[in-house]
A protein has these predicted regions:
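Short S/T/G/P-rich N-terminal loop/turn motif that feeds into the first structured element of a domain
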Residues: 22-273
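N-terminal secretory signal peptides that target proteins for export/translocation
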Residues: 1-8
């Protein structure tokens, strides 16, 4: 279930309010390809033998939302590593925006019952679904101003789970890493959907070659650390971290629905013929 599946605005408002009622849209409007301030991530695993049917329905849903100019956007990704699954990357500037989108979507489904039926058909082909809300932490991100998601073809998402009360240790480790960092990544704090504290590190990639480049960049960044920083980071990893899992996802524009401004960043890729 993506945001398209949220048809109960009261429940949605409760979820967002419980997540973090203090996040609101402020400041100048960012560029269309900038990492969003708020993420709704939905991970789906399909029933055996139903992946192709779900994919067909997702492509058709994307086309219908384009046709009706529904102002709700998402990027659909498929797992390259880890278990087979889909991941929906729904951007927003605030939790309030997600709240409004949920109410808007309920109205769209009411006016277009064929879309609601199509969504139901998708959900009938799912074995499981998990929804996560996360908010960008600018002070932990680095190089985020260089990120342009319109050019991305893959996303590497690292999930970092911490022991309770060790958020400051994670922040310290990220701050120490920033000293010699050359890569670009956006860091998000999970506020609903996973055990807390959990952070997400999102890194856009333009090709699979960037995966190899990223490994080399990470190696150089680690070599560039001062000895004291390296030892402190290792200590934090041992004492504060519960788990780290990194996976690669491929973007599928034919199953995505992005804004015209976003698509203009690379129309040959995002606008399907």
């Amino acid at each position: 279930m993506t945001l398209r599946g949220i048809v109960m605005p009261v429940f949605w408002s409760c979820l967002l309010g419980c997540a973090w009622s203090g996040v609101s849209a402020q400041g100048p409007k960012p560029s269309p390809g900038a990492p969003p301030k708020v993420l709704l991530l939905v991970q789906q695993q399909m029933l055996p033998g139903k992946a192709a049917e779900r994919q067909r329905l997702e492509v058709e849903t994307s086309r219908r939302f384009d046709e009706f100019n529904v102002p709700i956007t998402w990027i659909e990704l498929e797992a390259v590593t880890g278990p087979p699954r889909a991941l929906f990357f729904d951007p927003a500037s605030s939790l309030e925006e997600l709240d409004r989108a949920g109410a808007m979507l309920a109205n769209v489904f009411s006016a277009r019952p064929e879309l609601a039926q199509q969504q139901q058909q998708i959900e009938e082909r799912l074995a499981s679904s998990r929804t996560v809300v996360a908010v960008r932490r600018d002070e932990l991100s680095f190089g985020a101003e260089r990120i342009d998601l319109t050019k991305a073809r893959y996303l590497r998402i690292t999930v970092v789970s911490l022991r309770p009360g060790r958020e400051r240790d994670f922040a310290e480790a990220e701050t120490r890493r920033r000293a010699g960092a050359d890569s670009a990544r956006a860091v998000y704090e999970v506020n609903a959907g996973l055990e807390q504290p959990t952070f997400l590190i999102v890194e856009p990639l333009r090709s699979l070659q960037d995966v190899d480049k990223g490994i080399e960049i990470q190696r150089k960044e680690e070599q560039g650390l001062e000895e004291g920083d390296r030892k402190r980071i290792d200590e934090i990893l041992r004492e504060a971290y519960v788990s780290i899992e990194s996976n690669l996802y491929a973007i599928h524009p034919e199953m995505s629905h992005v804004s015209k401004e976003f698509a203009a960043g690379d129309p040959g890729y995002w606008i399907q013929k």
